[in-house]
């Protein structure tokens, strides 16, 4: 899952930086891009939680 998350982070660096600046909505968009690219192979809640840990 982590490698997929990093793929999304690298594809949307602007969303990562806006999340780091306090925009919590950006995390939802990152999860949305993850689902769009990889489908529901992983639980979106787990993906979201893991993204928070990695950012």
Q: What label would you give each PLM region?
A:
Residues 1-55:
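Charged, compositionally biased, marginally structured helical/coil segments
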């Amino acid at each position: 899952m982590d490698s997929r998350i990093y793929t999304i982070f690298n594809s949307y660096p602007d969303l990562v930086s806006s999340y780091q600046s306090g925009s919590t909505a950006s995390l939802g968009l990152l999860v949305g891009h993850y689902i769009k690219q990889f489908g529901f192979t992983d639980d979106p809640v787990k993906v979201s939680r893991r993204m928070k840990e990695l950012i």
